[in-house]
Amino acid sequence: MDSIFCSIFHMGENWLYFPILVDLYLLLCKNTGREMKKQAASNRVLVQPERGKSMYDYILPVSNKDIISIAKRAFNLVDPRLMGHGERVANIMFQMMKAEGGYTPVQMRNLLTLAVLHDIGAYKTDEIDHMVEFETKHVWNHSIYGYLFLDYFSLFKELSKVVLFHHSSWKQLENMDDVSEPVKKAAQMLQLADRLDIYFENPKNRMGREPFLTYLERERDRKFSSEVIDLLLDTPLVPPSCDYIGISPQFDRIMETVPFTEEEKESILQMLIYAIDFRSPHTVTHTITTSVISSELAILLCGQKHAVNDVMCGAMLHDLGKIGIPVEILEYPGKLSPQAMNVMRNHVNLTEYILGDSVSDAVKNIALRHHEKLDGSGYPRGLRAADLNVPQRIVAIADIVSALTGTRSYKGAYSKNRTLGVLTGMAEQGLLDSGIVGLLVERYDEIMDSVREKTGPLLEKYQEMQDRYWEILYQLEEKEGEP
């Protein structure tokens, strides 16, 4: 029977028969007794990963340029005032590193990636108000969260303190014995690049090179070390042209010189996803829950690695666009107004913008169609059954299960019976694939055990990050108050 599912999974012209086949499969499982159930369980073993690898390991088939492009487009949506900021800051740092010399391609790639990602902790409008002021002190929140995301979820842990201290003055940094000299220098370079961009992005300052140079001299060995100021002055970014907006072709070449490993690409993607999910305590595990349910269903239906991989990738990417939705809408403790609901629904279009042409059409469509319904009543395109293949239907169902079983600002977590009641009701109304819903009902306990196993450590990380945030904030504010 596994061969039947594998065939249907990939034969687009026969997908209409899929619900019938699943129903037949479930009927056979129930009627052939213990031996059939043992065989069904053994089918799981056939698609187990290699020893030492997670069942949920996946490969996102994108290049360095693609993964960085996804990150840049995502950050463009955090706030209009930060549009292109990370990319421009990375280019300024690139010019400073070129002026200094001595960096290996790997070091340059990692520091440029860090520059693109440096505001990953920024999502609160009130703090962004301060971030886009040229001279400001109230910016610890995003620096701490950015540091924690890098420390917990990336393979750039050794550079995470660069983000933590990228708004610290040189007078504070130079006496920190627990911070290495390379980290101090990189943090200073990042801060100076950040301030240069903020200054010249203000239309009033576009032609004002002299005031900026005066500012640098005033802050020499106070806010910025003499070393990094002189590095900046050795670039073409301030004298004579101030033309830092165009991205050098060499920048892209450096980013492609040393390809990211699959693990590194996954870590960048995870940071993006958790930066979105962690905006609310109610959605911490939403993406990973959706992904686990999706992959479990795909594994049960067909064991081909590439098919399961597409489903997993699509599920992981499905809510990236929520980075551009205001927190007050995501966290609204009640029914949204029609206007607010339209804003919320726009997250699918924003996801499409973020993904661009950086992923395959198969993966992109899985991500973009998770709110479509078989009867055409879904969004954003009102697609019908004939337009929706099995992988897309799987993720749509998994997303609903994750939403129902999780807490939200407007509801508590649904019980098993209530969740399955909603799903079967939607299947009976022709909204969801009845075959996949039937399989989920049959395997619900097993699938949700996998969800709990996978989400437990993430919840622990989330709580630990919250505790560390307050601890670090207290320490930094104490140091800031020292003479």
Regions found by a protein language model. Name each.
Residues 32, 40-41:
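Ala/Thr-enriched low-complexity intrinsically disordered regions
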